[in-house]
Structure formats: structure tokens, C-alpha cells
Design a protein with these regions (language model features):
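Conserved, structured core segments of small domains
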Residues: 1-112
């Protein structure tokens, strides 16, 4: 499984259209994703000012576009989706909440 941190508004739009298209896809050619373990750091870095954030749990085998694991400037490998993300590849959506100013994953998480 891979994950995608995004704001609730963009997720709602994606559900309406059946696909997620981000600015990064237009500008860099791919959609940024992460592992579950990397997701809290991603949320902290890019979504600290967002009120409503969700964590999409994605089944890679259901993603129609190519997924490449690439090394970022911090030395970690991240999954990048080279095309639109079809929403039927999203197998779970989790409200990503802050506790004491930090994003925290739920204690029980359906992550296969």
C-alpha cells in the first residue's frame, strides 16, 4: 500500500470526477505519494496550515498509471504516480487529525 496526504476539498473534487489531478502532475509529471511511515512527516511539511486533511490509502495494483519509487532530496524513496490517480484505487480514506499541533495516525488503522 501507498498513501497520499491531501486536503479534504481536493479529495471531494476527486471523488466527483473519478480521478485526482494535482498541480504536481502538471508541473513535475507525477503525483507525490508516500509510505504510511512517511505520511506524518509529509503532512507536517506540506499541510500544517490545512484545517481538513485526509490520508488516502492506495492499492498500487489498482492504480492505472505507472508508479515509480524515487529518491528525494532527503535520501528517502517515495512512490510517484506518473499520471492521474484513479479514485477506485483508493481503498481507505482516513481523517488525518492533529493532536497537540502534530499529525497523528489513528491507533487502529485498516492498512493491509
Amino acid at each position: 500500500m501507498i498513501t497520499k496526504v491531501m486536503n479534504q476539498k481536493d479529495w471531494e473534487k476527486g471523488k466527483q470526477t473519478g480521478e485526482i489531478i494535482e498541480d504536481s502532475l502538471r508541473e513535475e509529471g507525477f503525483i507525490h505519494c508516500s509510505s504510511l511511515e512517511q505520511s506524518t512527516e509529509v503532512a507536517k511539511k506540506y499541510f500544517s496550515n490545512e484545517a481538513e486533511v485526509v490520508l488516502l490509502v492506495i492499492e498500487p495494483d489498482l492504480v492505472k498509471a505507472e508508479i515509480k519509487y524515487e529518491v528525494a532530496s532527503n535520501g528517502q524513496k517515495y512512490p510517484h504516480i506518473y499520471g492521474v490517480l484513479n479514485v477506485d484505487a483508493v481503498v481507505n480514506v482516513i481523517a488525518f487529525r492533529k493532536e497537540n499541533g502534530a499529525f497523528v495516525l489513528p491507533a487502529t488503522l485498516d492498512y493491509k
